C-alpha cells in the first residue's frame, strides 16, 4: 500500500493502482508529473507545476487546486517522509489530485555511461505527460529485455525524438543538439538549454546518423544528466563519457 494525499486527505492506495501503464493502473485519463527532492527540498518544482497546469489547459482537465495549494500539499508529503532524497509523483485525474512519494535510489554507475536502443513506435501528444503510458512502457520493456538503460523512440522514417522516460541530446564537432518539437518539454532539458555554457542548437538525428555523433546524453528529472556510451550495441565516440558531457555533469 502507498500512503498518498488524495484531494488533501491521507489514504492508503494499492501500489499496483498507481503503476503507470500497468493493467492495474486505476486512472487511464489524466496527467502526471514526477520530480525529485534533494535533502527534503523539491528540485525545479515551479516549472513542473507550470507544465502540469499548461497540460491541463491543453487537455481541458480541471484541477481543483491552485499551484500554491499544491505546493503546500507537496511540502506536507515531503516532510512526512524520513528520506531526504525522494521521488515525488503528482497525479491529476478527473475530480482527484493524488500526491505521493517513494525513495529515490540511483545507481551511480549510470553516470559512467549507459547503453540505449532505438524502438519504432507511434507517439500521441508527446508534449503532454498523460497517464496513458502504455506506449512508453512497452518501449522501455524492450530496452530492459535488451539489458539497456533506455529506449529511444523513433518514427517510421528513422528519426529520433526522445527516450521513453527521458529527453536526448547529442554532440557533433563540439556542438550540442536536441529536438525542437514533438517531444516532451522536459524540465532538465530546458535547464540545459537555458543554462548550459555550451550553446544548444535544434536539429534532427536519424538512426542512420547515430554513428556520426561524438557524444550523447539523456536528461530526466530523477537522474539529471545520464551519459550514453553505446547506441544499438555500437560505441558512441570511444565508448566512454565525452568531454562536453563530463563538463555538463559537473555544472549540473
How would you label these PLM feature ranges?
Residues 80-94, 98:
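Ordered, amphipathic secondary-structure segments that act as subunit-interaction surfaces
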Residues 1-76, 93-252:
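Helix-start/capping segments and mature chain N-termini
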Amino acid at each position: 500500500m502507498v500512503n498518498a494525499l488524495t484531494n488533501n486527505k491521507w489514504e492508503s492506495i494499492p501500489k499496483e493502482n498507481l503503476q503507470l501503464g500497468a493493467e492495474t493502473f486505476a486512472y487511464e485519463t489524466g496527467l502526471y508529473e514526477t520530480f525529485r527532492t534533494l535533502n527534503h527540498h523539491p528540485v525545479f518544482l515551479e516549472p513542473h507545476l507550470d507544465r502540469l497546469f499548461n497540460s491541463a489547459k491543453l487537455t481541458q482537465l480541471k484541477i481543483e487546486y491552485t499551484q500554491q495549494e499544491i505546493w503546500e500539499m507537496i511540502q506536507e508529503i515531503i516532510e512526512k517522509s524520513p528520506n531526504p532524497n525522494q521521488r515525488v509523483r503528482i497525479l491529476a485525474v478527473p475530480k482527484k489530485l493524488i500526491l505521493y512519494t517513494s525513495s529515490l535510489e540511483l545507481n551511480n554507475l549510470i553516470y559512467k555511461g549507459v547503453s540505449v536502443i532505438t524502438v519504432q513506435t507511434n507517439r500521441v501528444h508527446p508534449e503532454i505527460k498523460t497517464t496513458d503510458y502504455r506506449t512508453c512502457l512497452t518501449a522501455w520493456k524492450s530496452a530492459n529485455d535488451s539489458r539497456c538503460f533506455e529506449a529511444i523512440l523513433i518514427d517510421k522514417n528513422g528519426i529520433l525524438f526522445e527516450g521513453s522516460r527521458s529527453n536526448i541530446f547529442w554532440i557533433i564537432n563540439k556542438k550540442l543538439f536536441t529536438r525542437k518539437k514533438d517531444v516532451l518539454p522536459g524540465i532538465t532539458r530546458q535547464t540545459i538549454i537555458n543554462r548550459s555554457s555550451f550553446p544548444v542548437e535544434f536539429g534532427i538525428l536519424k538512426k542512420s546518423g547515430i554513428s556520426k555523433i561524438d557524444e550523447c546524453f539523456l536528461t530526466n528529472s530523477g537522474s539529471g544528466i545520464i551519459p550514453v556510451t553505446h547506441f544499438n550495441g555500437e560505441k558512441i565516440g570511444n565508448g566512454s563519457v565525452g568531454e562536453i558531457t563530463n563538463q555538463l555533469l559537473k555544472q549540473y
